[in-house]
């Protein structure tokens, strides 16, 4: 927090990013082995079938250490800079699914098994919406959703429409209906 506030003051820019929240994949899939058979704890590269989706743990924000840390950061930032906008970067359901599948398997699923990718996105949607509500209630000024960019790689409009669009529209509507301000950071002509 001191670093963010100090840097903002020194450079004079507006707004502070409290962080990028990646706790959903870790909480739901961190107990599962990745494609190398290792349990790393971050939930990356652990879902490769419908059976793996069933092995995911339910999302419990009260038990998520990453969310607790982010909420504390928001509280400290608000105390230090009460009038400065604070935002959090979050993943849309498809981005959480992408993490849970791992990059190579996710791209492959989007082309060869889009039903699996959509099923996983649907499975994590409630967790994304719930996290967004908690962060909004914590006092952030807006939520930032980068999409449809995955780890710096853009995807085609066709793949976006086939695998991701419906989930994004639905989740974003639920979050906006709650009253949250969101920024959708698009990549390419997807508006």
Regions found by a protein language model. Give the residues of each.
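Catalytic cores of phosphodiester-bond-cleaving enzymes
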Residues: 10
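Acidic/polar active-site rim loop that often engages polyanionic ligands
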Residues: 49-56
